[in-house]
């Protein structure tokens, strides 16, 4: 690549790999095991360390820190990594930390995501594609976030929680439980408020199926009998609804967290 794309104050360690048309602004620091793929742009004062790869067309804004060691006491300098996909926008003061031995040794971020100012993505998180994290969203370790999920500003997610596809979490929500796909949650303590119907409509989901799925989750979380029985009954009743099937599959998976439920 042309040296004219690298500011004279940037510090790039020997061994770092830069693709075509990479742009590195003033006072950036790039470690020796970092890979920046084609068309990556670092605005200024960006620090990227560790075994870290940034996918093509990703833009990172000032004072972001990517690939630093995880914030856990038992970290023993294991060679864990951070992998970030393509076409991501990573705004000012975002932190994405490397994986750990207890979580597969990797933190992974997909493609086409927007992380607004001050977002923190903890060790061993697995983030999908097309997600939006508003300002100062904080994810603890080992969290999975499905495609198209939206998390409102200043929300915090407890370690090991799962955030389902197409779900939406309102701002200022502490989330200590799994959020089902398409779920809409918010509160001082995150509770299920229904489905993310507006977001589902924008993504082209069938309106009739979406409304039917809303009725289905009300039966699951508020109906008669025990929870497992209700899941089975709803699965049989709505077996032609692909949205309900996706939610049922999520509910039937093993998890170390409870589910966000309707407020009593």
Curated annotation (Swiss-Prot):
Pfam families according to UniProt: Acetyltransf_11, Hexapep
Pathway: Glycolipid biosynthesis; lipid IV(A) biosynthesis; lipid IV(A) from (3R)-3-hydroxytetradecanoyl-[acyl-carrier-protein] and UDP-N-acetyl-alpha-D-glucosamine: step 1/6
Alphabetized GO MF terms: acyl-[acyl-carrier-protein]-UDP-N-acetylglucosamine O-acyltransferase activity
EC code(s) of this entry: 2.3.1.129
GO BP: lipid A biosynthetic process
NCBIfam families on file: lipid_A_lpxA, PRK05289.1
Assembly notes: Homotrimer.
Entry function: Involved in the biosynthesis of lipid A, a phosphorylated glycolipid that anchors the lipopolysaccharide to the outer membrane of the cell.
Record-stated family: Belongs to the transferase hexapeptide repeat family. LpxA subfamily.
Designated name of the protein: Acyl-[acyl-carrier-protein]--UDP-N-acetylglucosamine O-acyltransferase
Lineage: Bacteria, Pseudomonadati, Pseudomonadota, Alphaproteobacteria, Rickettsiales
Gene: lpxA
């Amino acid at each position: 690549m042309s040296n004219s794309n690298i500011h004279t104050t940037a510090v790039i360690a020997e061994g770092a790999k830069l693709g075509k048309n990479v742009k590195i602004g003033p006072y950036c620091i790039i470690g020796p095991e970092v890979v920046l793929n084609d068309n990556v742009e670092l605005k200024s004062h960006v620090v990227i360390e560790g075994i870290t790869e940034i996918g093509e067309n990703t833009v990172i804004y000032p004072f972001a820190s990517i690939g630093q060691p995880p914030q856990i006491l038992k970290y023993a300098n294991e060679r864990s990594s951070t992998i970030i996909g393509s076409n991501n926008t990573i705004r000012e003061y975002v932190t994405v930390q490397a994986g750990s031995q207890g979580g597969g040794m990797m933190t992974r971020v997909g493609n086409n995501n927007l992380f607004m100012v001050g977002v923190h993505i903890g060790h061993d998180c697995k983030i999908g594609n097309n997600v939006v994290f508003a300002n100062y969203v904080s994810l603890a370790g080992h969290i999975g976030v499905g495609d198209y999920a939206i998390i409102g500003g200043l929300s915090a997610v407890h370690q090991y929680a799962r955030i389902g596809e197409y779900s939406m979490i309102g701002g200022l929500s502490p989330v200590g439980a799994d959020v089902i796909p398409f779920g809409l949650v918010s509160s001082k303590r995150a509770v299920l408020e229904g489905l993310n119907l507006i977001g589902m409509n924008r993504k082209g989901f069938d309106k009739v199926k979406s409304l039917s799925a809303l009725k289905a989750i009300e039966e699951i979380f508020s109906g008669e009998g025990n929870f497992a029985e209700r899941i089975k009954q709803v699965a049989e009743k709505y077996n032609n609804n692909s949205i309900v099937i996706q939610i049922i599959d999520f509910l039937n998976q093993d998890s170390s967290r409870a589910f966000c439920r309707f407020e009593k």
